[in-house]
Amino acid sequence: TFCDGALSRKNKELIATAIGIVTNCESCMQWHIEQAVKEGATLQEVLEAVEVAIEMGIGPATVNARFALEVMEECF
């Protein structure tokens, strides 16, 4: 599932990060942000994934995104 295909593994990890935010899964956010960074994701790319999650998840995702931002501080 997370192998390179039509979408790169990096992009799949960014998608999974956004889903983790929307579903409020902290362990998912932690894992997928770390994996996205290992696959070469930049700070800007991760931030844009967070922004998409906030846009799609409205209020609750905004609160959940704070955890993702804390993880990003550790990774960058």
PLM ranges: what are they?
Residues I15, I19-W31:
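Short, thiol/selenol-centered motifs that function as redox-active sites or metal-ligating centers
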Residues S27-Q30, E34, I58-A61:
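Charged/polar positions within long, soluble alpha-helices
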Residues K12-G20, A49-M56:
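Alpha-helical scaffold segments that form or flank carboxylate-/histidine-based iron centers
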Residues Q30-Q44, L69-M72:
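Iron-sulfur (Fe-S) cluster-binding segments and ferredoxin-like electron-carrier domains
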Residues L47-E73:
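C-terminal structural segments of small proteins and small subunits
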Residues T1-E13, V63-F76:
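Acidic, glycine/proline-rich low-complexity segments that act as flexible tails and inter-domain linkers
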